[in-house]
């Protein structure tokens, strides 16, 4: 079902204990965005909301534990994130939606397609793999660096390591600083960040990827080789695309992990071409 309101921002009461903050902008088929690990939904406001709200109803939301949403003290799971999003679509009387997820959000979007297939029309999963059964609850590399540097410096250094190529950092220091400030100013509490990491690590879809029948675009940056675990996002994304029955693989040239911010025009062009070709 298509939505008609131009923009709505409010809290949706998921149940007695959970409120999910969301924003719906535009008109048309729902375009549901899932952010990366422990990142609130307003990260999409810079480029993706203005671009896609011209043709769609863009729905962004803050995961539980981030932004203006509730911060329950129990451990989170990707199932929780999916159930929150599915309930939000029900609340808005919207769907099926084009589900878009970046990094951890891509895995959440795939889980939504598996758990609520009728609520998903198409999938766009960016810079992510299916997970692994042997993934530790918190990656050793993260534990070591966070212990040495502290929470905020870890997030800053990790974002610098995976987010941009060295050339981009040298050529655009002002843009890098701007994005880092956005990320650091919206950090959740440490305990909520770690709950997100544990949820991501526990989300192993590797045995179920072939069950996803939706048209799916797997997107990744050409130089997206870093991750919190030390593995390569690009290698994981390429392997994922080969497993999907209706998967299509695309690369954003010359970019690392943060191409939605550094080269949104190319990312949007690839996405729009996919949406047309998979109609």
PLM region descriptions:
Residues 134-136, 154-208:
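Conserved alpha/beta-hydrolase catalytic His-Asp/Glu region
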Residues 212, 218-220:
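Short beta-strand/loop motif that positions the catalytic acidic residue
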Residues 110, 114, 121-150:
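Flexible "cap/lid" loop of the alpha/beta hydrolase fold
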Residues 252-264:
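Catalytic histidine-centered segment of alpha/beta-hydrolase-like enzymes
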Residues 16-68:
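Conserved HGGG/HGGXW glycine-rich cap/lid loop of the alpha/beta-hydrolase fold
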Residues 101, 105, 109:
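Gly/Ala-rich beta-loop-alpha elbow adjacent to hydrolase catalytic centers
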């Amino acid at each position: 079902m298509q939505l008609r309101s131009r923009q709505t921002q409010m809290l949706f009461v998921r149940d007695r204990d959970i409120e999910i903050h969301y924003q719906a902008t535009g008109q048309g088929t729902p375009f549901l965005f899932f952010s990366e690990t422990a990142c609130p939904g307003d990260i999409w406001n810079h480029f993706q909301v203005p671009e896609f709200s011209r043709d769609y109803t863009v729905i962004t939301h803050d995961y539980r534990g981030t932004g203006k949403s509730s911060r329950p003290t129990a451990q989170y799971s990707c199932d929780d994130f999916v159930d929150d999003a599915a309930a939000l679509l029900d609340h808005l009387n919207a769907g099926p939606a084009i589900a878009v997820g970046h990094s951890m959000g891509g895995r959440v979007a795939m889980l939504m397609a598996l758990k609520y297939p009728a609520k998903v029309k198409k999938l766009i999963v960016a810079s992510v793999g299916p997970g692994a059964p042997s993934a530790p609850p918190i990656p050793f590399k993260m534990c070591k660096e966070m212990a040495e540097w502290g929470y905020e410096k870890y997030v800053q250094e990790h974002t610098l390591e995976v987010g941009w190529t060295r050339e981009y950092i040298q050529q655009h220091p002002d843009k890098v600083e701007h994005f880092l400030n956005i990320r650091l100013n919206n950090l959740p509490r440490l305990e909520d960040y770690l709950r997100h990491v544990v949820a991501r690590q526990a989300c192993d879809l590797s045995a179920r990827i072939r069950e996803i029948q939706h048209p799916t675009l797997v997107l990744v940056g050409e130089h997206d080789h870093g991750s919190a675990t030390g593995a390569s996002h690009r290698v994981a994304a390429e392997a994922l695309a080969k497993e999907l029955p209706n998967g299509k693989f695309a690369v954003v040239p010359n970019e690392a992990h943060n191409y939605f911010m550094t080269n949104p025009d190319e990312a949007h062009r690839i996405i729009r071409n996919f949406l047309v070709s998979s109609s």
